[in-house]
């Protein structure tokens, strides 16, 4: 534990939980390959640490940017496919092509530009055609897809290795999602292409309806043990714990104000612990005054006043056991019978768990737990 005590705030990643969640992916879509989505620093879990952990067990990695792809290429050993899920800017494309990175194509013009770059670099560009069936973000419109696809098939430096779409509401709307799946299947059948990877299902769709008829699924949040649906799935195991340390303990008199704006004033003598974490670390300022809590010695303790950039103040009056400067505090995770999830924090902050996790800043150290 000595190494952890040298840190002010840190995240611990549990490989066993990642593997458990990966096994669940394989059970719910047994015939599909798995693309682990590791964009946004692996949803706050640490990009390099997560890729090293999962590399031997998955078929592909999905990222959002060229920088993310270039970061993980040198550490990918068994897994050979990385795909940039977003649209690349024109000045990024040549680097992607030279490094054999799979890219998305959402228009005929984009395909033409990739084909030209492929010819210039004597490369066959591996592309995934994206069809917009209801997300309204990227992709061919359904009306243009078949006509444009026919022309793209003639491009000599384009290898259509994938076809995909994205579900905007697979966490709660089965009817619309089913409609998307049927439209996608119809377009694929009429396109006269036979891509290796057909992928539709994100985490929510994978949990609710499996592979959705694809040959690959794209789990993101569920890989990290968080349910993307309103109902918590007990099969998922959260892979992340966020901890910080106490850096001061004081007794404040009745009538003492705490933090900026004096939004909280003690109504009685209060034992207050100052914790070494703040919005500069990604702990949301929007949790101020919302009844957010941390866990100290297995007990929930409420945050007092506003979250500041580097510190929060917590009421520890209910803690009977001795506490000292340097003691660990749980921000997200479990201690004894108490636990705080990213979903709980998200609700109190008025946001979603995706934002809580991806908001954990780079100055928070990521540590892989050795729990073999």
Question: How should these model regions be labeled?
Answer:
Residues 2-15, 19, 68-70, 88-90, ...:
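Active-site anion/phosphate-binding pocket segments in diverse small-molecule metabolic enzymes
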Residues 5, 10-13, 17-20, 27, ...:
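Active-site-proximal beta-alpha core segment in soluble small-molecule metabolic enzymes
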């Amino acid at each position: 534990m000595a190494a952890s005590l040298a840190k002010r705030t840190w995240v611990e990643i549990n490989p066993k939980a990642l593997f458990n969640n990966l096994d669940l992916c394989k059970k719910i879509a047994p015939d599909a390959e798995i693309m682990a989505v590791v964009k946004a620093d692996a949803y706050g879990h640490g990009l390099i640490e997560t890729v090293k952990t999962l590399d031997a067990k998955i078929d592909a990695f999905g990222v959002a940017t060229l920088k993310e792809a270039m970061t993980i290429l040198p550490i990918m050993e068994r897994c050979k496919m990385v795909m940039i899920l977003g649209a690349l800017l024109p000045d990024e494309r040549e680097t992607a092509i030279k490094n054999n990175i799979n890219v998305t194509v959402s228009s005929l013009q984009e395909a033409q530009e990739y084909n030209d770059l492929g010819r210039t670099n004597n490369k066959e560009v591996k592309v995934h055609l994206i069809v917009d069936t209801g997300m309204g973000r990227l992709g061919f419109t359904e009306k243009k897809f078949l006509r444009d696809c026919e022309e793209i098939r003639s491009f000599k430096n384009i290898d259509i290795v994938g076809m995909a779409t994205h579900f905007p509401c697979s966490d709660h709307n089965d009817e619309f999602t089913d409609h998307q799946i049927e439209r996608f299947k119809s377009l694929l059948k009429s396109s006269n292409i036979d891509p290796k990877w057909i992928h539709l299902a994100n985490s929510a769709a994978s949990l609710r309806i499996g592979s959705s008829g694809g040959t690959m699924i794209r789990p993101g949040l569920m890989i990290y043990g968080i349910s993307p649906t309103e109902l918590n799935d007990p099969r998922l195991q959260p892979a992340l714990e966020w901890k910080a340390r106490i850096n001061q303990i004081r007794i404040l008199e009745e009538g003492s104000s705490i933090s900026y704006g004096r939004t909280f004033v003690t109504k009685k003598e209060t034992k207050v612990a100052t914790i070494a974490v703040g919005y500069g670390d990604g702990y949301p300022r929007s949790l101020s005054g919302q009844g957010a809590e941390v866990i100290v010695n297995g007990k929930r303790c409420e945050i007092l006043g506003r979250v500041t950039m580097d510190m929060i103040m917590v009421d520890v009056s209910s803690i009977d056991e001795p506490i000292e400067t340097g003691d660990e505090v749980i921000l997200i995770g479990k201690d004894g019978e108490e636990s705080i999830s990213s979903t709980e924090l998200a609700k109190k902050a008025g946001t979603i768990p995706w934002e809580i996790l991806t908001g954990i800043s780079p100055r928070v150290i990521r540590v892989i737990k050795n729990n073999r």
